Structure formats: C-alpha cells, structure tokens
Amino acid sequence: MEYASEKRIESKALPGVWFTIARMSFGRRIELTRRIWELAGKAEYLEAGADVRGRLEAALVAAEIDSVYLRWGLRKIEGLTVDGEQATAELVVTQGPEALCRDVVAAIKAECGLNAAEAKN
C-alpha cells in the first residue's frame, strides 16, 4: 500500500491554480493542536462577549487561527505568481488573493475532519 502524506487540490476560487496540503496524521494533529490551543480558547471567550470590541477581537483571533491552519497545512501552490514571484504559503497569506486563502483553509479543515461548526471557529 502506498500512502501519500499530501493531497493536491484544484482551487475552486481560482480555476487553474492547484495547491498541495498536508494530510492529517497523529503527529501533525498534535502539532496543530498545540499551535491553536491558546488562540482557540481566547476566541471562545471573546465570542461570548456582547460588545462590539469583543466581537471584533474574536474575528481577529479567528483570522489568526485560519492563518495558523494555512501556514501549517499548505505545502505548495502551482499556477500562481504574486507580483512576479512564485506563490508560497507566506506570500499567499501576506499578499495573495483572499479567496484562495479561504479555499485552502477550508480544504485543510476538511482534511482535519472538522465539521462546518468546528471549521467556523
């Protein structure tokens, strides 16, 4: 049996762009959980607040969590350059199309086995 530790996916947001993500493993799940543990607790606390500032902070923390997922799971991007440079995970996060970031994060969360409600957080 051959097991591929990565998965190649065509972007729904940008047809013709392909990205490769890490598949979930026991060790990767531990690593990812460690990376998002503190942020996830903070997001949950802030979401419980009723004021606008708390909700804005919760949205910021949720975006930071998505950034962790993206940097953790995105291995390669094909078919995209950003300002003349071959796209990388860091370049896509900082300067790339937001729709692609959302597409990649959704694929990574699906690979992690998160349902829609869990993926939202």
Give the label of every model feature segment.
Residues 1-12:
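Short acidic, Pro/Gly- and aromatic-enriched capping/linker segments at domain boundaries
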Residues 17-20, 24-121:
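Short, surface-exposed, charged amphipathic helix/loop patches that serve as local interaction elements
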